[in-house]
Each structure stands twice: as structure tokens, then as C-alpha cells.
Amino acid sequence: TKGQNIAIGRDALKVQTDGGEFNVAVGTYSLDENTFGDKNVALGYVALGKNTEASYNTGIGTESLKLNTTGTNNTGLGYAAGDVVSSGSQNVLIGASTDPGAADATNQTVVGYGTTGQADNSVTLGNADVTAVYMAQDKGATVHAASISLENDETITNSTDTQIDMSSTTLVVGNGSVDPTI
């Protein structure tokens, strides 16, 4: 292979010839089809296996980012993390079977077993079984948002523990909104 690559395992960096430098492939079929991708790290069976030209990806775990061919700056951590990504970029996928919402997704951060991202430029915490999200162990964290949306008949309960600073934001409830100047 071209200079400064490390390949350990059956068919790791197998196709690598003249292109691609500074790659690390550890595991059977890891970075197996890489031809011109640079600075990738693949640890695990078939990790980044279909990668051809993509650079700056990190796939740690069996089948992590296995279908990525041209997407850049992706991180997949866990069994089959990001295994649907083919051309998406800037995605962070943490947990077994985590995936962005589409193969060409951009800038999705997805955390938790079996969780699927919802939209580009978004963060998704937890799969459909998650019933609560805590921003701090003691619930003392401050959450900043430009808007807060409540769907259907959902409401904020326990108003003594809830404080919403409306000085520079809009609270969206259902199909309406609350004017912060009122």
C-alpha cells in the first residue's frame, strides 16, 4: 500500500494501491475497498469496509460505517454504528445500531442503542423506548433553545420546577405561539 498506512487483519486495506495515506485498518475487511481515502481509522470486522475515496472517518466496532464510500468526517462508535451511511458527512453516531436519518445525512449527532437521527443539523438522544432525558445528574443544568415545541396535547408539568426565560425566544405550543413581551 501507499506510504504510512497500517493494516492488520485479513483483507484489511486490501484494494489500497497508489492512493490514500495515513489510514489505520485493524480487523478483517476493515477499509477493505479503500483506494484514495486518507486519514481514516477502522477498528473491527468490516469497519469502513466499503470506503473508497472518503477521508477523516473513524469507525470503531464491528460493521461500523461499513457502507460509507464517499462521506467524510464521520464517527461511528459501536456495533453497526452508522452502517447505513454511504455519502453523509459530519455525523457522530454513538451506540450499537445507531444511524442517521438517511444515507446522505449531514451533521447528525445520534446517541443511544438503536437510535435513528431525525434531521440534518440535529441531535437525537435515545431511541423510541427512552422516556426521560436528563441534562445533568441532579437536573440542575440550564438548557438553551431558540424555541420549545410541544406536540399534540403534551404539556410542561410541575411549574414550580420549570422556568422558561422568554426574554429572547418564542415558546411554540401546538399550532400557536406565545409572545414573550406579553
Regions found by a protein language model. Give the residues of each.
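Glycine- and small/polar-enriched repetitive beta-structure motifs of secreted/surface proteins
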Residues: 1-142
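Register-specific beta-strand positions within repetitive beta-rich fiber domains
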Residues: 10, 120, 129-130, 136-182
